[in-house]
Amino acid sequence: MKYDEIKITTRREINICEHAISKLEKIIASMERKYGKGSKDFFRELEGTPHPYDSDIVHWYESFSALTRWKERLAAHQEIMKL
């Protein structure tokens, strides 16, 4: 793979990451408005309590976890672009 092809592929990956992050941030923002708390505070309060089976909370937690992974992936691709 040539250097230009690597840059193009990496740029595409960055765009995919940014799109996924945008969607997840919208989901998380709507849940934070609904429950009136920030994600980190809300999940910190849930630690040590029985697992909530409310589908909204589960979806919120999964989205929050996925957001962390997408941000890590984005950072890795941005690091490649710097080379």
Feature map (PLM): residue ranges:
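Short, charge-rich amphipathic alpha-helices with coiled-coil/heptad character
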Residues: 1-11, 45
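Amphipathic alpha-helical coiled-coil segments
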Residues: 10-24, 28-31, 60-63, 67-70, ...
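A generic membrane alpha-helix/interface feature
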Residues: 43, 54, 74-77
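Short, glycine/alanine-rich amphipathic alpha-helical segment
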Residues: 46-65
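Short E/K-rich amphipathic alpha-helical oligomerization segments
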Residues: 29-51
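Generic secretory/membrane-interface signal
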Residues: 7, 19, 48-50
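Hydrophobic alpha-helical segments, principally membrane-spanning helices and signal/leader peptides
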Residues: 3, 21-23, 41
